[in-house]
């Protein structure tokens, strides 16, 4: 039993991001916590408007996660690829499998509750899931955001292989230029051909899309962070103001204001801007804005234990928040059917879709944000306690060797 729990713990943890500890880099701790907050908020159709009128979440936050990974990336020509691959499998693929399996179980129970019957598993479902994992990266609908884990793993592995082969002659600025050209080529290809025709090429194309942001994180760490940190508060406010005005001007000349964003990057869709450079510019603007804001005003919350715990468990939030949205909907449906009418709660819509949100008043979106963050974190806390308790019980029962 203990070994099963330990294995599941490994599968549902995310290396350094899942340990109960205090992160030493407080700025990037806060940045990752803000990033996962934005993921949850965007899936509630934005309960909290964090500058999204100027810088929409979907214009930068997934590239920002890759930028953060790049900041901490230390691979080089001396990296042992076998050891590195095993490490990334443990910290990325095992958590992906564990969380996806757990969400599948929750989805089964939620569907049983809201439909009133057990849904049969379709024939060939496992093959369908495996195909999705290596294309879109999604194992099931309630774990849709976990596509990012597969893409991040592939991006890190391709980058490590290139750095291993070319590390001794590697120039970050030259490689950033190369990666940028490949990134623009991906956008052009997708807009020209369409993502539907590239379904089996989605994963390598997403890797090419994200590579420049990985290199940007490394360049920032090695060459720019010191300069950026030393800027005065007035200069940082000026930078943020210029970025907001710049994005505002972009929304004025694009066909639609929201063209600065790209909604469905997991399937390389949603690139509505006529310019292939738009996603790159939008991502740089968003990353630099929030990086500067965190550097400017982040210190009061950087010591928060809750923010630290949230940052350490971003993958739990990423994987479970939609399931907890649906748990809240199940509660509302039960109240609506057995206690008192919940005004305008659309039971039929909820039965058909995991993405239904009750929106009688706009402020109720906050309830989804709260449960989407506290639910997964509470589940993680209970899980950690369970593993620790069972571990202690088994340790006590283990016979000690005689002297």
Predicted regions located by residue number:
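Alpha-helical transmembrane segments and their immediate juxtamembrane cytosolic regions
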Residues: 1-403
């Amino acid at each position: 039993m203990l070994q099963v729990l330990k294995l599941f713990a490994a599968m549902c943890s995310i290396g350094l991001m899942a340990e109960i500890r205090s992160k030493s880099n407080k700025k990037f701790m806060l940045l990752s916590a803000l990033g996962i907050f934005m993921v949850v908020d965007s899936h509630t159709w934005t309960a909290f408007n964090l500058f999204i009128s100027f810088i929409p979440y979907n214009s930068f936050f997934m590239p920002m996660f890759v930028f953060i990974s790049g900041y901490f990336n230390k691979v080089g020509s001396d990296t042992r690829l076998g050891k590195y691959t095993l490490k990334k499998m443990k910290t990325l693929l095992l958590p992906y499998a564990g969380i996806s399996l757990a969400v599948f179980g929750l989805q089964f129970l939620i569907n049983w509750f809201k439909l009133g019957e057990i849904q049969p598993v379709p024939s060939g479902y496992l093959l369908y899931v495996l195909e999705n994992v290596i294309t879109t990266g999604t194992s099931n609908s309630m774990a849709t955001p976990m596509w990012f884990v597969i893409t991040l793993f592939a991006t890190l592995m391709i980058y490590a292989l290139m750095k291993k082969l070319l590390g001794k002659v590697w120039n970050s600025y030259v490689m950033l230029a190369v990666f940028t050209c490949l990134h623009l080529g991906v956008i052009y290809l997708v807009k020209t051909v369409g993502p539907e025709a590239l379904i089996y090429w989605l994963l390598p194309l997403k890797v090419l899309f994200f590579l420049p942001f990985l290199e940007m994180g490394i360049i920032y760490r090695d060459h720019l962070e010191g300069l950026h940190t030393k800027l005065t508060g007035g200069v940082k406010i000026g930078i943020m103001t210029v970025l907001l005005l710049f994005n505002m001007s972009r929304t004025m000349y694009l066909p639609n204001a929201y063209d600065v964003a790209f909604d469905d990057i997991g399937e390389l869709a949603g690139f509505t801007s006529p310019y292939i450079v738009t996603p790159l510019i939008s991502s740089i603007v968003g990353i630099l804005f929030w990086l500067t804001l965190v550097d400017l005003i982040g210190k009061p919350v950087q010591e928060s234990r809750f923010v630290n715990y949230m940052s350490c468990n971003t993958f739990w939030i990423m994987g479970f928040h939609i399931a907890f949205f649906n748990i809240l909907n199940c509660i509302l449906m039960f109240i609506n059917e057995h206690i008192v009418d919940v005004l305008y709660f659309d039971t039929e819509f909820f039965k058909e879709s995991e993405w239904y949100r009750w929106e009688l008043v706009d402020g109720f979106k906050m309830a989804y944000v709260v449960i989407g963050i506290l639910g997964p974190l509470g589940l993680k806390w209970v899980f950690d306690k369970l593993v620790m308790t069972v571990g202690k019980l088994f340790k006590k029962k283990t016979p000690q060797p005689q002297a």
